[in-house]
Amino acid sequence: MAPSGCPPSLPLCVCLFLASGFAQAGRLLVVPMDGSHWFTMQMIVEKLSHRGHEVVVVIPEVSWHMGKSLNFTVKLLLVLNTLEDLNYHFKFFAHNQWKTQEVGMFSLLKHSGKGFFELLFSHCRSLFKDKKLVEYLKQSSFDAVFLDPFDVCGLILAKYFSLPSVVFSGGIFCHYLDEGAQCPSPPSYVPRILSKFTDTMTFKERVWNHLSYMKERAFCPYFFKTAVEIASEVLQTPVTMRDLFSPVSIWMFRTDFVLEFPRPMMPNMVYIGGINCHQGKPLSKEFEAYVNASGEHGIVVFSLGSMVSEIPEKKAMEIAEALGRIPQTLLWRYTGTRPSNLAKNTILVKWLPQNDLLGHPKARAFITHSGSHGIYEGICNGVPMVMMPLFGDQMDNAKRMETRGAGVTLNVLEMTADDLENALKTVINNKSYKENIMRLSSLHKDRPIEPLDLAVFWVEYVMRHKGAPHLRPAAHDLTWYQYHSLDVIGFLLAIVLTVVFIVYKSCAYGCRKCFGGKGRVKKSHKSKTH
């Protein structure tokens, strides 16, 4: 009998709901990337686990932020490097950005970033040498692989176990998105990654955009040489990066058209920008006190991301000087040496609740490195930005926000205290910046489904249907000349030329018959009269 006060059908409905949930539960292999990439991916993984799926996450034993969780199974990968090695390679890369910003992909990946990527690639080799782990993964009979393609290993695992895959990324290096998803990317109006161009390019910029694409095709195979060698060794057959990317079932990107410029998409591409945004939580007593003490001037939130903890002393002092010139209270997440000229209005903290502070009514501006997480938290909370991009897609993100009139971009190498002061005063006092960011916030929030729910749906979709082959374009099966219809153009051109040739020959023959014969008759007639 149903409990008193409850509808008789309620327990039955609950049982049916739970039964259907368990019936749909599956097994998911997750191959993430460390750092800020993991923060948003973890949200999806945890929700999938809460929905009853058996989730297994493979992570290296040495990492910054990835660790054990009670919500899903973690398999540790034994690696040769230590945490000190990881920190050394990343700090070497990050510190170089304060000396000379490596804007182009060639310089970024070939120089300071090369050692860091080689370290990541080595993790994949270690994984396949762990026969016990590989056998466990093989026997687990997963329904799909949810992966970050940054280090390529997830793609190799998906191909090795012949599993459908869902890619989760902020963007794909090189031209492999064009080839892997067969997604058109016309260089005439789709800026290449790291180019800092907009979708409205001058002739000179379009030339450089085309050259960037050509450089990608020439250089990227060299950069991913180690990854391809590992894949070929593991799969026991020669493969290319295109071979690894082509089988992807769903491409999931941490962006949307509020940030991204309008461009072509494929049916298996999903935009989930702002997945890290959430309703601001009440501040702790410490931060609430800081905010309340700011008075009518409000606060400015300053963070260069979780991966940048130190700034060269001279640059830190320039920044501190600029911050001391504005009336707002500055909350600066910084773990480096305290600048000697730090003003009273600037508070250094080792950690801050960034989203919660940006969601406070007293937030006036946001100084950010333009990472996708920070950019979207700024958009969601409607806070204008002063952007100081350092590397990677941060340059492109800053350009997009600046183009939309929602912030000001500064070159961290060349900026002075005056530049930072003026930029802050501009975004705080010029109402257009606040109006523009509020408009973007309104556009971003006006959607039929939350990004997190959309991401979970598509992962489960691939698990249920063992992939999404009906969304795979036939372009994957065409050769390059078939894709561009060069064979059709050649065939039609041959027909046209043949017809023109026949018509020409026919006309020439007719002319000879008509006019050539009359000439001979007249000539013969004249000779007789003489």
Swiss-Prot record:
Keyword presence, Lipid metabolism: yes
UniProt-listed Enzyme Commission number(s): 2.4.1.17
Transmembrane segments: 488-504
Locations listed in the record: Endoplasmic reticulum membrane
Entry's Gene Ontology molecular function annotations: enzyme binding; glucuronosyltransferase activity
Glycosylation-annotated residues: N71, N292, N430
Signal peptide residue numbers: 1-25
Chief site of localization: endoplasmic reticulum
Recorded topology in the membrane: Single-pass membrane protein
Pfam families to which the protein is assigned, alphabetical: UDPGT
Record-annotated disulphide pairs: none
CDD domains (alphabetical): GT1_Gtf-like (cd03784)
Keywords in alphabetical order: Endoplasmic reticulum, Glycoprotein, Glycosyltransferase, Lipid metabolism, Membrane, Signal, Transferase, Transmembrane, Transmembrane helix
Described purpose of this protein according to its UniProt entry: UDP-glucuronosyltransferase (UGT) that catalyzes phase II biotransformation reactions in which lipophilic substrates are conjugated with glucuronic acid to increase the metabolite's water solubility, thereby facilitating excretion into either the urine or bile. Essential for the elimination and detoxification of drugs, xenobiotics and endogenous compounds. Catalyzes the glucuronidation of endogenous steroid hormones such as androgens and estrogens. Produces dihydrotestosterone (DHT) diglucuronide from the DHT after two subsequent glucoronidation steps.
Protein name: UDP-glucuronosyltransferase 1A8
Gene: Ugt1a8
